[in-house]
Design a protein with these regions (language model features):
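Short, conserved, surface-exposed binding loops centered on an aromatic residue
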Residues: 175-179, 189, 203-207
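A short coil-to-beta-strand element that immediately follows conserved catalytic motifs
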Residues: 168-186, 225
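Catalytic core of Fe(II)/2-oxoglutarate
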Residues: 193, 202-204, 208-209, 218-372, ...
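N-terminal mitochondrial targeting presequence
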Residues: 1-2
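Eukaryotic intrinsically disordered and solvent-exposed regulatory patches
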Residues: 28-30, 198-201, 237
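Intrinsically disordered, low-complexity segments used as extracellular stalks/linkers
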Residues: 9-18, 72
Length: 388
């Protein structure tokens, strides 16, 4: 009809309204953006406006089959050759939760390994859409992922803008890129696993993760369940955050060291969450890591808070100093997270990394390491107990 809307246009508008109704999360407040800029993390409770929608998302994750064929009680360890195997391809295409597989580099042996983590299962929402469409139809009897699919689409369209809008008036506020190609979403069920200390953005040309956003969907969570995430802003207090229902935990992927405590006694299928990674501004990242060696040496003459502030904001400085500064914590978390075959490789590589730093021939950089260790030993911030 002339002047009127076509059927397709009306259908699209209805879908947009339904999306807003189902997925319009509570606005990200400027106070959360300010806390993120100042402390490196923020917590947003009751993130999904409609609690029933969050419950449906949890139920859809729990309806997905878990594929535990990759191993037994020990870690599955593979040496990588840079090529994708047939098994890797099938993992991408199959709509099942698969064992978490962690890349680990042993610099001393110049080898990269792939470890399957016991008790942690994941599904990447970027896997083939055809598989997801089949799941929607319920043709395989597994239930649908319709709500998760719509949430996935909404994160690509709106989540980056939500953070950017909240940070407009915040000094050094976060800036992330909107769009489907600039975010990753993974679903996860944890039936008894843990994660050692790490950064979500390990660096490299292909990594531009800026924000990690974890939405927890554990309605019956109790403290005895464990599974907390522990964040460690450099030289700050250890922040333990419980994975309670409809809680969004946000932190900088490249500069906030963190681990996950072992999940135990979770009701149902286990600890359920989904993680969204948002990419940052490329130009901004290039500026930050210009010459960390000279910057660190020059800051030796400055007050400790200036050195700490610089390290917190500089990804390459964090990667250089974190194992040295928190070497005991790294080791303990490895022991608690990898009880199988991968543990020996990881402990050896960790010890080797620390030893190589001790043997650095750059006297000024050695002074930086000594200064950082002295600051850690006298750090009163760590005495604070933060549990959220």
């Amino acid at each position: 009809m002339m002047g009127g809307k076509s059927f397709a246009e009306e259908e699209e508008e209805e879908e947009e309204e339904e999306e807003k109704k189902m997925f319009f999360w509570r606005p990200i407040e400027p106070s959360s953006a300010e806390h993120l800029a100042r402390e490196g993390y923020a917590v947003v409770d009751d993130f999904v406006r409609d609690a029933d929608t969050a419950k449906t998302m949890r139920d859809e994750i729990c309806s997905m089959p878990i594929d535990d064929d990759d191993g037994d009680d020990d870690d599955d360890v593979e040496e990588e050759d840079g090529k994708e195997s047939d098994d890797d391809a099938s993992r991408r295409d199959d709509a099942r939760l698969k064992p978490n597989r962690t890349h680990f580099t042993d610099a001393r042996k110049n080898k990269r390994y792939l470890f399957s983590k016991p008790g942690v299962f994941e599904y990447d929402m970027h896997m083939k859409r055809s598989t997801n469409r089949e799941r929607k139809e319920g043709s395989d009897g597994r239930g649908t992922t319709k709500t998760l699919e719509r949430f996935f689409e909404a994160t690509g369209k709106h989540l980056a803008d939500a953070f950017n809008d909240a940070a407009k008036e915040v000094r050094d506020g976060v800036k992330v890129k909107p769009g489907d190609a600039n975010r990753t979403v993974k679903l996860q069920i944890n039936t008894g696993g843990a994660f050692p200390y790490h950064f979500d953005n390990p660096g490299g040309a292909q990594q531009n993760r800026k924000l990690t956003c974890i939405l927890y969907l554990n309605e019956d969570y109790e403290d005895k369940c464990g599974g907390e995430i522990v964040l460690v802003p450099f030289m700050g207090p250890f922040v333990t955050i419980r994975p309670i229902f409809n809680r969004l935990v946000v932190f900088y992927s490249e500069t906030v060291l963190h681990r996950v405590n072992k999940a135990v006694n979770f009701p149902g299928k286990g600890r359920v969450c989904l993680t969204i990674w948002l990419d940052g501004d490329d130009d901004e990242n290039c500026k930050k890591n210009a010459n960390i060696r000279n910057d660190l040496v020059q800051l030796l003459a400055s007050p400790p808070e200036d050195l700490i502030s610089y390290i917190r904001q500089t990804p390459d400085a964090q990667r250089f100093l974190s194992r040295w500064t928190y070497r005991d914590e790294y080791e303990i978390s490895l022991l608690e997270s990898h009880p199988g075959k991968g543990l020996e490789h990881m402990l050896e590589a960790h010890e080797d990394a620390v030893k190589r730093q001790r043997k650095i021939k750059d006297e000024e950089l050695l002074r930086v390491l000594e200064r950082v260790r002295e600051m850690r030993n006298g750090n009163r911030e760590e005495m604070k107990i933060i549990r959220l």
